[in-house]
């Protein structure tokens, strides 16, 4: 359309009747290139996974709340450890490791 209003010369009508159904080719004839070096995952997913793995390996601060084994006072600890070392510490908590508060350790209570 040229101008603000359509004119009759610009309107094209297809006035041929369709009496028979014409088949439509739905097959895509696109050829894909070989992708031996590419992975199925997008780059941002791979980068996110690498960041998570790197974060697990580097030490991070973790807050631990536990009880004194003598007087049951709540103790707050902050440790800096990797995920693997933190799991080892938690395993020790489950088995034999106990904490003593500073008052019980000094024997003033």
Swiss-Prot record:
Q: According to its UniProt record, which protein family does this protein belong to?
A: Belongs to the papillomaviridae E7 protein family.
What organism does the record attribute this protein to? Human papillomavirus type 70
Q: Where is this region: E7 terminal domain?
A: 1-47
Where the record places motif Nuclear export signal is 86-94
Q: Where are the zinc fingers (unnamed)?
A: 68-104
Q: Where is this motif: LXCXE motif?
A: 26-30
Q: Which UniProt keywords apply?
A: Activator, DNA-binding, Early protein, G1/S host cell cycle checkpoint dysregulation by virus, Host cytoplasm, Host nucleus, Host-virus interaction, Inhibition of host innate immune response by virus, Inhibition of host interferon signaling pathway by virus, Interferon antiviral system evasion, Metal-binding, Modulation of host cell cycle by virus, Oncogene, Transcription, Transcription regulation, Viral immunoevasion, Zinc, Zinc-finger
Q: Name one GO cellular component term.
A: host cell nucleus
**What name does the UniProt record give this protein?**
Protein E7
Which residues lie in coiled coils? none
Described by its record, this protein's role is as follows:
Plays a role in viral genome replication by driving entry of quiescent cells into the cell cycle. Stimulation of progression from G1 to S phase allows the virus to efficiently use the cellular DNA replicating machinery to achieve viral genome replication. E7 protein has both transforming and trans-activating activities. Induces the disassembly of the E2F1 transcription factor from RB1, with subsequent transcriptional activation of E2F1-regulated S-phase genes. Interferes with host histone deacetylation mediated by HDAC1 and HDAC2, leading to transcription activation.
Q: Where are the transmembrane segments?
A: none
The answer to keyword Transcription applying to this record is yes
One Pfam family name is E7
Listed GO MF terms:
DNA binding; DNA-binding transcription factor activity; protein domain specific binding; zinc ion binding
Q: Where in the cell is it found?
A: Host cytoplasm; Host nucleus
Question: Any domain commentary?
Answer: The E7 terminal domain is an intrinsically disordered domain, whose flexibility and conformational transitions confer target adaptability to the oncoprotein. It allows adaptation to a variety of protein targets and exposes the PEST degradation sequence that regulates its turnover in the cell.
Mod. after translation = Highly phosphorylated.
Record flagged with keyword Ribosomal protein:
no
Q: Which BP terms in the Gene Ontology apply to this protein?
A: DNA-templated transcription; symbiont-mediated perturbation of host cell cycle G1/S transition checkpoint; symbiont-mediated suppression of host innate immune response; symbiont-mediated suppression of host type I interferon-mediated signaling pathway
InterPro entries annotated for this entry? Papilloma_E7 (IPR000148)
> Main localisation, per the record?
host cell
Oligomeric state and partners?
Homodimer. Homooligomer. Interacts with host RB1; this interaction induces dissociation of RB1-E2F1 complex thereby disrupting RB1 activity. Interacts with host EP300; this interaction represses EP300 transcriptional activity. Interacts with protein E2; this interaction inhibits E7 oncogenic activity. Interacts with host TMEM173/STING; this interaction impairs the ability of TMEM173/STING to sense cytosolic DNA and promote the production of type I interferon (IFN-alpha and IFN-beta).
């Amino acid at each position: 359309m040229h101008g603000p209003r359509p004119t009759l010369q610009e309107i094209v009508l297809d006035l041929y009747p369709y009496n028979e159904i014409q088949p439509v080719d739905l097959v895509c004839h696109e050829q894909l290139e070989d992708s031996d070096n590419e992975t199925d995952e997008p780059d941002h997913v791979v980068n996110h996974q690498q960041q998570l793995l790197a974060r697990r390996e580097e030490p991070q601060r973790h807050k631990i709340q536990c009880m004194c084994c003598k007087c049951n006072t709540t103790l707050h600890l902050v440790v800096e450890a990797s995920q693997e070392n933190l799991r080892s510490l938690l395993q020790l908590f489950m088995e034999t490791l106990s904490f003593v508060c500073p008052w019980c350790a000094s024997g003033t209570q």
